[in-house]
């Protein structure tokens, strides 16, 4: 009988893999390559995550969790919160995670497993984390931020995308939301 994964060890491995992906990206790297980079074996990654695709989803989930953890620290005024969140999300060191997120998302909307399992949590977890804020406004903000990130990842036009993010914050400010 196979041993159940040790959750503390899984957490350590996930943290190490997230750090590795931040430094060198994931692309089409093999499990063996990623495992060697974090000082373990591909068998241990398989034991704790099941497959390369499940590892990719675990990375996306962890990065999303870390980003949701920022919500309580954001300013209370919506326009200021948008600007602060964008300032965080636009950091170049997050780009490998953003590329991975969109890759997994695209594969999921095509129905490919295990990526389709990231829905509907990819939205609902943000709605829950926002608490009492109007869910339609949270969903709108999430959609705009993801659209801006997709534009940034695809074009690398930081100035143009930053201007669009500022325009969105200005719209929210003028609307009095």
Q: What are these model-predicted stretches?
A:
Residues 12, 16-23, 69-73, 100, ...:
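Solvent-exposed, amphipathic alpha-helical segments
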Residues 61-67:
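Short, basic, alpha-helical segments at the C-terminal edge of helix-turn-helix-like DNA-binding modules
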Residues 110-121, 130-177:
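Hydrophobic/aromatic-rich alpha-helical bundle segments in the mid-to-C-terminal region
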């Amino acid at each position: 009988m196979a041993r159940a994964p040790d959750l503390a060890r899984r957490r350590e491995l996930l943290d190490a893999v997230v750090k590795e992906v931040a430094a060198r990206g994931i692309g089409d790297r093999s499990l063996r390559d990623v495992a060697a980079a974090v000082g373990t074996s591909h068998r241990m990654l398989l034991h704790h995550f099941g497959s390369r695709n499940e590892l990719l989803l675990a990375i996306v989930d962890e990065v999303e969790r870390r980003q949701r953890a920022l919500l309580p620290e954001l300013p209370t005024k919506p326009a200021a919160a948008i600007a602060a969140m964008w300032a965080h999300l636009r950091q170049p060191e997050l780009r490998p995670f953003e590329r991975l997120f969109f890759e997994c998302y695209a594969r999921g909307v095509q129905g490919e497993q295990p990526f389709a399992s990231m829905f509907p949590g990819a939205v609902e977890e943000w709605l829950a984390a926002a608490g009492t804020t109007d869910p339609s406004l949270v969903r709108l903000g999430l959609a705009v931020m993801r659209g801006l990130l997709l534009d940034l990842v695809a074009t690398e036009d930081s100035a143009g995308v930053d201007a669009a993010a500022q325009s969105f914050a200005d719209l929210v400010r003028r609307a009095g939301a």
